[in-house]
Amino acid sequence: PKSVYAILKQLKPDKYPKVDDDATILVEYPSATVQIMGSWNWPKGRKDMHIYGSEGYIYQDTPGSMRVYTHRKEKTTLPPKLKEPYNDSFYYLKAAVRKEIQVQPYDLSSLENNLIGVEILESAIKSAKSGKPVRF
């Protein structure tokens, strides 16, 4: 990323007295901006993703399907079924530890990829404290 900007809040201090319970994080890349919103304060748990582009969008409201809009049409698609060990995080970890699979640097569960995630989150905390974007 080029920069990270974040606002962290504590909306329910009586319920979560020691932590921020609401976060909005903007991650700026050369040709895109990602908005991450996370909260323990919402009345309903959410695990959705919305991606907007210049020619359409993708909504993934549930893990089991996504809506793709392009060329003025929306189509619902189902994700492909993953084979073992990729269909279960514990089987995946076991296979990686036993070297039954080769984890690639940009796989979702790779160390390299997750270190980028940690760097983004640490930058979000610094940004929230300073009130300014953290540049990379």
Cite the ranges covered by each PLM segment.
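Short beta-strand segments
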Residues: 34-36, 47, 76, 134
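A short, sequence-level motif marking secondary-structure junctions
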Residues: 39-43, 63-67, 80-86
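Short polybasic amphipathic segments
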Residues: 49, 64-73
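Broad, structure-driven detector of short, well-ordered beta-strand segments within folded domains
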Residues: 56-61
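C-terminal helix-rich "cap/oligomerization" subdomain common to oxidoreductases
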Residues: 95-136
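Glycine-centered tight beta-turn/hairpin loop motif at sheet-sheet or coil-to-beta transitions
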Residues: 29-33, 55, 72-73
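Active-site loop of classical SDR/Rossmann-like NAD(P)-dependent oxidoreductases
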Residues: 80-92, 109, 116
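Rossmann-like dinucleotide-binding domain that binds NAD(P)(H)
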Residues: 1-33, 40-44, 112
